[in-house]
């Protein structure tokens, strides 16, 4: 049995997919797409090593200890070159995680022809009339190249050392004078590029699990600046002591959302030792945090917030706070509830030394079936 390693390319920005969630984090059942695709291929062969390129290594590592991860580059070629540094097997298989449904039959065709050339690649024939600059091309000579592809590792490394931009391994190998062998590709191995492509693939739907997070924050009164809650000015001078603008509600809610998605906490994301967050707009930081949560495949279901303050009274501001949260997070207002309570003059809150906020949120996986 030939010694083969597997590289899965999952560091793309999903620009053409045009959704808040990166396509590699779409959930198929409970698995993000990148993991589903990698599990699928890894079930076909005892690979020597499996390497996944990533733009979010810390988060991906939460899912498995079975693979190695490496930060991707700005282009496909850069990402592949970095991943190849970890590979020493004779052959390497490279695939895009966006090709989710590669079959065992296609995989076997690649393996069976391993000794035929320097790179074995699947390709589809073109059935439709094809024009270039309004002139018909000979479609019999046109191939639609797919992945996974298997290459001789040393030759692929040498090809990429030219620092040219190759869009796949076969063109890189061919540029070195290497021999390419084509096997029959398949429709199911088409790349998921645009959100409309989801309708063409029979993928498992995201599970209906719900993820709950809580956030709690406390701040002391004492700054002669506006008191802000959810970006709404409550009082012109009763400001809270903080590195940022002191919006304790926004801080609590940020922590709740990050916690539900298992993405750490506000202190990790926006440390108070970093001067770029000095007097920062906390609602803008909340939005940025939620963008990160959506990027990895989640969306909000609802928000419930309890503000604990002896003073000032908040009854007249609750509606404005709910509206501002809804606008910031692009969430229906009927999914947001803000409550206010005192501590019956007990403790530091009762002594009007500060205030606290407890936030609870529920998240679900982004439902890509609605696209």
UniProtKB/Swiss-Prot annotation:
GO biological processes: isopentenyl diphosphate biosynthetic process, methylerythritol 4-phosphate pathway; terpenoid biosynthetic process
Q: Where is this site: Positions MEP for the nucleophilic attack?
A: 139, 191
Q: In which pathway does it act?
A: Isoprenoid biosynthesis; isopentenyl diphosphate biosynthesis via DXP pathway; isopentenyl diphosphate from 1-deoxy-D-xylulose 5-phosphate: step 2/6; Isoprenoid biosynthesis; isopentenyl diphosphate biosynthesis via DXP pathway; isopentenyl diphosphate from 1-deoxy-D-xylulose 5-phosphate: step 4/6
Q: Which domain of life is it from?
A: Bacteria
Keyword tags: Isoprene biosynthesis, Lyase, Metal-binding, Multifunctional enzyme, Nucleotidyltransferase, Transferase
Q: Where does a divalent metal cation bind?
A: 217, 219, 251
Q: Give me the reactions it catalyses.
A: 2-C-methyl-D-erythritol 4-phosphate + CTP + H(+) = 4-CDP-2-C-methyl-D-erythritol + diphosphate; 4-CDP-2-C-methyl-D-erythritol 2-phosphate = 2-C-methyl-D-erythritol 2,4-cyclic diphosphate + CMP
Binding sites annotated in the UniProt record for 4-CDP-2-C-methyl-D-erythritol 2-phosphate: 217-219, 243-244, 265-267, 270-274, 341-344, 348, 351
Where is the stretch described as 2-C-methyl-D-erythritol 2,4-cyclodiphosphate synthase? Answer: 211-371
What Gene3D superfamilies does the database record attribute to this sequence? 2-C-methyl-D-erythritol 2,4-cyclodiphosphate synthase, Spore Coat Polysaccharide Biosynthesis Protein SpsA, Chain A
NCBIfam families reported in the protein's UniProt record:
ispD (TIGR00453), ispF (TIGR00151), PRK09382.1 (NF006899)
Q: Which PANTHER family match?
A: 2-C-METHYL-D-ERYTHRITOL 2,4-CYCLODIPHOSPHATE SYNTHASE, CHLOROPLASTIC (PTHR43181:SF1)
Q: What is the name listed in the Swiss-Prot or TrEMBL entry for this protein?
A: Bifunctional enzyme IspD/IspF
């Amino acid at each position: 049995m030939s010694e083969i390693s597997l590289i899965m390319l999952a560091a793309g920005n999903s620009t053409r997919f045009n959704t808040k969630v990166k396509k590699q984090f779409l959930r198929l059942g409970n698995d993000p797409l990148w993991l589903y695709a990698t599990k699928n291929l890894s079930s076909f062969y005892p690979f020597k090593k499996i390497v996944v390129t990533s733009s979010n290594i810390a988060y991906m590592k939460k899912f498995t200890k079975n693979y190695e991860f490496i930060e991707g580059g700005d282009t496909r070629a850069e990402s592949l070159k970095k991943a190849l540094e970890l590979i020493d097997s004779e052959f390497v298989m490279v695939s895009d995680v966006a090709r989710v449904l590669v079959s065992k039959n296609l995989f076997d065709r690649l393996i069976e022809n391993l000794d035929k050339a320097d790179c074995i690649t699947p390709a589809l024939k073109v059935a439709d009339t094809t024009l270039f600059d309004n002139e018909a091309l000979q479609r019999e000579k046109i191939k639609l190249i797919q992945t996974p592809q298997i290459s001789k590792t040393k030759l692929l490394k040498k090809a990429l050392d030219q620092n040219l931009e190759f869009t796949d391994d076969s063109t890189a190998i061919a540029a070195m004078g290497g021999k390419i062998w084509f096997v029959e590709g398949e429709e199911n191995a088409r790349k998921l590029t645009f959100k409309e492509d989801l309708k063409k693939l029979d993928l498992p739907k995201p599970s209906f699990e719900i993820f709950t997070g809580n956030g709690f924050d406390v701040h002391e009164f004492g700054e002669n600046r506006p008191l802000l809650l959810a970006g709404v000015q409550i009082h012109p001078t009763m400001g809270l002591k903080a590195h940022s603008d002191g919006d304790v509600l926004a801080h609590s809610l940020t922590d709740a959302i990050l916690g539900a998605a298992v993405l750490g906490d506000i202190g990790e994301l926006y440390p108070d030792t970093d001067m770029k967050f000095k007097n920062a707009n906390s609602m803008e930081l909340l939005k940025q945090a939620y963008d990160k949560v959506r990027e990895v495949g989640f969306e909000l279901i609802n928000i419930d917030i309890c503000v604990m303050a002896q003073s000032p009274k908040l009854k007249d501001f609750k509606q404005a706070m709910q509206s501002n949260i809804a606008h910031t997070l692009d969430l229906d207002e009927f999914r947001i509830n803000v409550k206010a309570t005192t501590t019956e003059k007990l403790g530091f809150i009762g002594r009007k030394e500060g205030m606290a906020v407890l936030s609870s949120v529920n998240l679900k996986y982004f439902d890509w079936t609605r696209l």
